[in-house]
Amino acid sequence: MNKLFFVVFLCLIISVLAIGPADLGCTDMPQAEFDEKNANCEKCGNEEGFGEEMVSRCRDKCFTDNFYQSCVDLLNKVYEEKDVPVPPEE
C-alpha cells in the first residue's frame, strides 16, 4: 500500500512540475518567461501559505490577470511598505 501511495504521489508531483506554456494556452510565451512567471506563482502559493488554489488563480489567463500582479506585489513586499505608518512632518 505504501508503494502505491508513493507512486501516486510521485506522479502528482511530476505532473505539477512538468507544466509548460502550451498547457495553459500560452503559445506565444517563451519557455524562460513562462518558467519565471510560474515560479512566482509557486512561491506565492507555497511560501506565503496560500496553497494550490492561489497558484491556479495566479496562472489564469496566461499570467495576464490582475491576480498575477498582486501575487508579484506580495512577493516583493509592496503591501507591507504601503501599510507602514508615516510619522507626521513637524
Curated annotation (Swiss-Prot):
It comes from the Eukaryota. Residues 1-18 form the signal peptide. InterPro entries: Crust_neurohorm_sf. Gene3D superfamilies: Crustacean CHH/MIH/GIH neurohormone. One of its GO terms (cellular component) is extracellular region. Keywords: Secreted, Signal. It is found in: Secreted. Expressed by the venom gland. May increase the toxicity of alpha-latrotoxin and/or other venom components. Is non-toxic to mice and to the cockroach Periplaneta americana. Belongs to the arthropod CHH/MIH/GIH/VIH hormone family. Co-purifies with alpha-latrotoxin. This is Alpha-latrotoxin associated low molecular weight protein. It comes from Latrodectus geometricus (Brown widow spider).
